[in-house]
Amino acid sequence: ILRWQDESDTVYGDRWIILIAYIIGLSIGVHLLNLLCIPAIVLVFYYQKYRTISLKGVAAAIAISGLLIIFILFVYIPGMADMGGWFELLFVNVFGLPFHTGLISFLALTFFVLAGAIYRFRKRMLHTSLWCLLMLTVGYTTYAVILIRANANTPLNENAPDNIFTLKSYLNREQYESAPLLYGKTYASEPEYVPEGDYYRVKTTKGSAVYRPDKEEGKYKIIRHKEDVCYTQNMLFPRMWSERMASSYKNWTGGNEVAPTQKENLTYFITYQLNYMYWRYFLWNFVGRQNDVQGSGEPEHGNWITGISWLDNLRLGDQSLLPESLRQNKGHNVFYGLPLLLGLFGIYWQWNRSKKGKQQFSVLFFLFFMTGLAIVLYLNQTPGQPRERDYAYAGSFYAFAIWIGIGAAGLCDALRRKTTSTVQVGVLMTICLLIPVQMATQTWDDHD
């Protein structure tokens, strides 16, 4: 997007936007978290294309970026699978053609229609948008590898997504338990019952049909319909939702296992989901890490540390009393908080660099927020994760690393304004370079 910014007024500038659409399509096949870069991209576009910048305009740009994410995530991705399923049923169950004929025909028709529309419509905005949609679709077809691999019947073929219907289930991650986001059940919620004759049954909402191929008849058959259980005692912003983890929630809130209050719900959100499952990982990278043993809240495993003894001992107890295996752990890295301080200075310096600096800050902030805290809100994680989840927030750490670089430039700029001595500026630059040197020497053994 920065290359587009440099060439946005040229004849070929829009090619960078089309390339971005293609990369987003490819990223769908890697991980959906890549879509969270869209708000930062849209803000760069807004700042470049509009001379008059206003808070209302920024809010509109952010809203449009949110709509783009919603379109790709909840309309485009499942919609392509749905339409492919309709074609598959028509061609196989009605026309009697072989399996996958409908899906292949749908993809061919999609590309034909998009190519025809690109040739027919020449207005710049519409033409570029159609190219973006085509490239998004081309990137999305990387999921064909999943179908091909599943049909090869490899030894490891979990959930066997060998047709469009099982592929849709795979894309929707239906093998995992879904977590409520804004409103829903808690771990103490009971199923809702409704009368049925002389008995009561659990109230459910009927979902879509589940199809499976019958290879003997050469057709798809409905084996069941999806059902969602309706619960009573729902709450807003439910964070403590999994009945399997009722006792684990108590460890983080100190509450009871009967029914969580909203206070306990928010306590869990702050102490576990925010502090333990995000800020702890953030501080690992920019302050220091105790060891690489997965922790569950205990003071000796997987915490962040500074390397400043009195401060670490105050938080976690006397670190010198830890067993030798933990003190000599290769994941023990101390940065003394220097990268964090330099990054915070970078934020301060960027924000105070007039109007342009504030615009740049907003782009980086939304990249930082959307690839960090927004993921925390969306995942709604339960205690006892099978592994550390720091990898999920790599984009957020990348954004803060940019602020560290800006902080180094800001320090040099600030000193240059106060002195003309090249020696002093050189000394400061050397000090700034010592920070990544310290990080490299500390983390080399964990990554060797």
What are these regions (language model features)?
Residues 150-347:
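Lumenal/periplasmic acceptor-binding loop at the mouth of the active site in multi-pass
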Residues 109-119, 336-356, 410:
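Hydrophobic, aromatic-rich transmembrane alpha-helices
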Residues 137-147, 424-448:
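Transmembrane alpha-helical segments
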Residues 385-410:
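Hydrophobic/aromatic-rich transmembrane helices and adjacent perimembrane loops
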Residues 12-15, 51-63, 94-104, 119-134, ...:
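Membrane-interfacial entry segments at the cytosolic side of transmembrane helices
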Residues 1-16, 45-54:
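Membrane-interface transmembrane helices that cradle and orient dolichyl/undecaprenyl
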Residues 33-45, 105-110, 408:
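Transmembrane-embedded, aromatic-rich helix segments that form part
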